[in-house]
Amino acid sequence: MFKHETVLLHETVDMLEVKPDGIYVDATLGGAGHSEYLLNKLNEQGHLFAFDQDQTAIDNAKIKLAEYSDRVTFIKSNFRYMKEALNERGIEAVDGILYDLGVSSPQLDERERGFSYHQDAALDMRMDQEQELTAKKVVNEWSYQDLIRIFFQYGEEKFSKQIAREIERRREVKPIETTGELVDIIKTAIPAPARRKGGHPGKRTFQAIRIAVNDELGAVEDSLENALTLLKPGGRISVITFHSLEDRITKYLFQEATKGPDLPPGLPVIPDEYKPDFKLATRKPIVPSEEELEQNNRARSAKLRVIEKIIK
């Protein structure tokens, strides 16, 4: 069964200031924890559109949310196509959108999905099991320079060159097939003193490959830009990020959206059309409480940012 600890459950949904008859989007259905809590706040006129590119997540959510089946629509799609998918269903604007950008724990924990550096499995890492690009293709077919780039940019890995060089050396002998082989390569490439510090040596490289396989950062940027155009006045977007790369994108897009145009200083009144369309609902990101961290260690790096479309 699809078990998933929902992070910042109440904060994320409560910050949307849910209207019982509103239209809402869960961009990252996952274990459906946020969806369930949100649906509980909707009446029969309200509706939730829930996106996930993983059919297993949708199948499990249909069971979990069966009592709300009349007010939820499941859409199997990457959230970067949210706007088109909603427009196709006659939805031009919504009251709120939430994102939980963590990889849902069941995907990490299912050995055959190939996300985990703790379990030996085929190199896969696809969120969408129908797409062609896999971790195996990245590791065996991408150039030395491209591997360095993703390890450094997406994994912030100090030993990117050494790991890419060792991958190149091994794959000339035979294709790299499994997560276990990749972990062995990483351990060989990273100097022993560094291996003993800062958690599992494979963590950063595996994160980088997962982001590359699923084009996660490109999808986040595309989706958030579209989400801002979908909001009704007074509507809000809640975004939970788990690492600095996604948080940087979210923070930048939200800051840009809340800026007005450059106007000469000292204007007595700023016309409405020059005022920004959005405001930050939280000056600083909301982080999990000590109590939540005790119950769910995966929440440690979570940050929640919220933006609101201004009613003019």
UniProtKB/Swiss-Prot annotation:
Main subcellular location of this protein, as a coarse class = cytoplasm
Q: Reply yes or no: does the keyword Cytoplasm apply.
A: yes
- Report the subcellular localization: Cytoplasm
Q: Reaction catalysed?
A: cytidine(1402) in 16S rRNA + S-adenosyl-L-methionine = N(4)-methylcytidine(1402) in 16S rRNA + S-adenosyl-L-homocysteine + H(+)
List the GO biological process terms: rRNA base methylation
- State the GO CC annotations: cytoplasm
Indicate which residues the UniProt annotation says bind S-adenosyl-L-methionine: A32, G33, H34, D52, F79, D100, Q107
Has UniProt tagged this entry with the keyword Membrane?
no
Q: What is its EC number?
A: 2.1.1.199
Q: Which InterPro entries match?
A: RsmH, SAM-dep_MeTrfase_MraW_recog, SAM-dependent_MTases_sf
Its family remark reads: Belongs to the methyltransferase superfamily. RsmH family.
Q: What function does this protein fulfil?
A: Specifically methylates the N4 position of cytidine in position 1402 (C1402) of 16S rRNA.
NCBIfam families in the record: 16S rRNA (cytosine(1402)-N(4))-methyltransferase RsmH
The protein depicted here goes by the name Ribosomal RNA small subunit methyltransferase H
Origin species:
Listeria innocua serovar 6a (strain ATCC BAA-680 / CLIP 11262)
The upper taxonomy is: Bacteria, Bacillati, Bacillota, Bacilli, Bacillales
Gene this chain is encoded by: rsmH
